[in-house]
Each structure stands twice: as C-alpha cells, then as structure tokens.
C-alpha cells in the first residue's frame, strides 16, 4: 500500500464546501510568500497567488508522518484523521442543514471535529509544541491525540449561532487555521496573539468562528459576554472556566436567524484572514482582500459577531434532571453542579485601598508589598475569599466546634472527639471549598517571591522538621491540605457519611492544622487544598500517569522502613491502646502467655502511660465498637502534581523524601541526553554547610517573625531569580552568589545558633539543572487545566537531610 505523505490539514471534503457550482478550483493566496535574492543583490518576491484544485491546497508533506529508521508510518493520517474526517464530514453537513434530529445525532461528533481541526493545523501543532520543552515528531503526535476535545465543554455551554451569507454577494473564505479565535480586546499585535497563541476561549470576550461552508459560519460566544457585552471584562475568565469536565446542554439550541450583508461577511473574512498562519483561499479572487471593502477596526468587529439579544432565551438558566434510579442532577448556566456560595464572595474597591492597607487578595500583606505593582491577571483573585482567609475561617470554626474558645484543651479533644464534630468540621471544609472552585484563581502567580512547595509525608510528626522548620529560609512555603473534601470522594469514604472511620486521622489532621495556623495567619505558609478535588479529570489523569511511572522507580528502602515504623506505631496506638482494658489484657495474655498477671498489669500500665503522652493518640476505649479506623499515608503532592503546582505558582520544590528526590533527579532537563549543571559549584558549597532547624513550631515562628536567616533567604531569592531569568553572564553570577551566600550564612548562623529551641542540624542539597525540571505528562496536565500564567519548568529543587547529633 502506498504511503500517504502529503497531509491535508484542512481536508479536501471541507474545501469543496467553498467551491462555486461547476468549479473545482480555488484562488489560493500566500500571505507570506517566499523571497529570492538575485546575483545582482536584488530581492524579488515569489508568486503569492495561484488557482489550484483542493488537492494542492492546505497540505504539508509529512506533517503527521512518523519515521522509525527507514520505516515510514502514515497511520495518523489514515487511521486517526481518516476516521475523524469521515465522522466530521457527516456532522458538518448535519449542521449546515436544519434537521434538528440530525443535530442531536451528530452533536458530540460536531464539537469533537471542530476541536480536532483546531489542533491539527501547522499553527495548532506549533501551539502544542510551545507548551513543551522539546517534542520530537512521535511525541508531538502522541500529545496531539492526548489533548483532543479540550475545548468542547466551554463551546457547548456558550451561545451557539450559525450566521448565513446566502443573501450576500460575498461569501466566507477558507484559511489554513479554520477554527479562528477573536477577542475584541486582543488585537492581532497584542501579547495574546503572538504566534502561535490565540486568546483563550475561557476569556469572557473570546468568540470562536468556524465557517461551515461558503454560506454558513458558526460562532461560539461565552454566555456572560453575550448577555451583557458592555459590562464584562473581556480578558477576565468566564465563570467555571475549567476546560475538561462533564456538562449537560441542549442539542437543539442554535440561533439561525441572521442573514449577513456584504459588509458583515467581509468583516468576518477580515478576521479570518488576520488570524491565518500563511494561506487563505476563496472561489473568487476579490474575496481574498476583504480589507478593501470595509473600514478595518479590530474592536468594532464585535458588533457584527454578537448574537441577537432576543434569541438568547435559549441559553442559560438552571437545569434539573431525574434518572431512572431516582437520583437527580442539577446544573446552572455555567455547568456548576451546586448553587454558588455567596458567602465566599467579597467586594473590594481598589481605589479605597491605601499603600499600607491590607492587600485585597487576602494574603495578609500590605498592598504596597503585594499586588500594588502587579497587573490584574498577575494577582490572585480579589473577588472571593483567598486560601489564607478560608483557612482562618476553618480555624475559627474548628475552635468553636471543639470548644477551644470555651476552655477546652487538646487533651479534651483526644477524649471527646465525636462523629458529630467530624461531620461539622468536614461540612465546613466542604462549604469553604466547593468542587467548582477555580483554584488557579486563588493560587499565587509566578513572580520574584521565593516560594517553595513541600512534597513529602503530610504528618504532624514529619512536617514539623523541615516543611515548617525551613520557614525562615524561604519567603513562602506551600503545603497541601490533608483534609478530605466531602464533595469529591466516594460515599463509602466520605467523612460526612462515615465519620467514625476518620477519628484517628482527624486527630492527626487537626494537630497539623494547629501547628500551621500561626504560620498561615502570618502568610509564611500557604496551606492549599488538593487541586484534584476541583477537577476529576485532572485526578484521573494524574492517577493514570502515576501508574505508568511507578514501574520506573522503586520506593526507596530507607524511606520504606521509616514509613513502616510510623505505620506500626500508629497501628499499635489505633488498635491495642484503644480497646477496653479487659480486651487489652486478653490481647496481651494471648500474645505473651508466659507473663504473670502482675507482669501483664505492669505492661498495661506502661502502655497506658505512653498512650497518654502521645498527642496523636485517641483517649477513647470504645473506638472499635462502631468499626475500624482508616489509616492514611499521604505523600502529597505526588511527582506529577508537585511539578504541576510548582509551575503554576512559580515555586521551587522542597522534599525530605528520598523517593521523590530520585523522581526529580530523573526529571532534569536533558539536551541530547545530557544534564547540564552550571550552578554546581554554588550548590556544592551550600550542601557542605550545616543549617539550623527547630522541631518546635513556636521557636521557628518567632525566628521567622524576628527576620531570622533573612540574609540567607535574600541570597536564596536572588539565586532563584538569576536561575529563572537565565542570565548570560552565568560565571559572574555564580561567583557573586557564592561570596554573598558565605557572608550571609556566617552572619545568620552566628546570630541564631543559640537563639532557637529544640534545634537540630540538617543539610540542603540544591539541584539546579539548566532548563530546570520538566516532564511531558505534567506539561499536558498544565495545558488541559487551562492555566495561563505558569512557568515552563521548575528551576530548582532542594533535598533536606537530617544530620546525626
């Protein structure tokens, strides 16, 4: 079978929809024709116009072909796009027609085809490449398939209109990137439109244009903008902007009442032409130059593209459905599955905020030190409660539920923790973090702040050492919240439905939260929820990626032993010590039958003393009367999500997990298979020093508030900025930072060596590869999440190692 190597990225069946009757050729215009330098020095422009059949238009040799040595593989063209085009052709024909039953039958295929058409063009493939550090042809084809249907949900939830050119003498043209994105606030020369970018379809003012043939053009418009175009910020994200999720929409809701004039069709053609990559085509030559027939003004095109106001009744509103099993489904106009929590909103007038007032983002910092000099899209949201503010609400609620504000102590909580309290705490947590939360709107954006994301065992006994203990060395530390979100978990494991099984875990989570609360209040620690709670597709992909990766790296033996010791200790505390005295006595007698009654009593008394002294031990001997306890070992975020969150927030990565460190080492950027470490002299110098940490959170907090280790922190921050900015005079930067580090280290160590309580020594191993840490799977997660402001890699990682006394 001959190989298909001339790949039509705009299929011929689609091109034929733009041919005039009794014609089989198109006028084909090259917007950027090749030039040739003559021997005499003159430069001439090659021919920019041709009249060609569809077979010679909009194709590129080996655009989808993959090579394995001398073997040529054309399966992407034949099997993937062959099927897509077959289904897409039927779907497009259905929506050119007016049979509503055909619309319903082909609805999903129609949207899927448009999405595939958007990413299969040279511009679409370049857009995919832009999101990855380096993609070969095979990887590019894999990633292209992995992100299909990325835009379908937001398109289907918007206003859908098909405008007609049947009464116009001018018809729609075809371009080399037919799925065209328009936002009146993002002109072609703006940062949003720098090739190969388009404004995100999640922005309120963004509209999508797709000519179905020369007589019909599909326009998608976001609902908020369509209903109130003059009072919406066009570059602000729409409500519930998550790209990949389930949604329920009407399949018959299409506006088809508008017949456009010549001027209006030419205006749409001008948009299509301006956003094309290189080639456009039309059955008549004059249609290739719409700018000659109109007054070109990018912003005013919005008037032509807005759907008629009297037809918008078909879109929006609330949707209720009942299934055969009696269960129900709810969805609002934006795809949210529960009513909006108005108590999470806040209204702040920026004009009334002074330089020294608290910043409107809720960070707890002064406005002048936080958002004052940032653009709006570089800030965390000012419209809803921040992560910090929600944590403070949660803390106040816990104080009230557990009675701390009425004199109750931690010892009382260990004795009295009840199912009702567990339910109330998790209900409060769930109300603060509804599953439709836009977490990317709340997480900090990349800037010159030295943020550090901790990834490791989330347990109050381990987090104390380095995650909290390193607070004086970094501007802000991000730690993932261990609380279970009741809105995002199977009912069998829901703490609101089955609270008893969470008693022991609740105690651990509460103690950790109490340790962290003063750091959260001061803005030193950002205690963020699991992003997967708000995006089940993200969670599913993360799990699948972790399964694929798990076979590459085994769990570190030293770490496994350490985790098993913790697990055994917890198991002992959760079982034997939480039984009634008589049952404990019987268990000891069964395990050690040679002990006398006196020895058994002495052993039980010793166990009881240890149990009383353990702050993580429940002091209830009826725990197992209602069932067992759920034991959780949470090493979060995992490898993929650690890179993901670090890139979203512009953080470096901190870990004390040997396994996670091995995973990070494997993720160093490699050029031609080789890792480059230009900062190795500096990182070796840092690794040779002993750093002071404290296992007492109060001592760590006092040190941080006193400005402790500020000189070292400043140098670390400057190193981070240097690495991110990838400065040319690297050798000079390394030498300068080495001198600054030694001076600041000696100064701070001398000052705080005897000031901190419960001190221990540790090492920080910095790993700073050129190109940072990157992983294709994480880049895909970022692309599909809709994140707009993330960095392309994680510049640095730090491994903490405890030193023997």
Short names for language-model regions:
Residues 224, 365, 374-375:
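A short beta-strand motif that forms part of the nucleic acid-binding face
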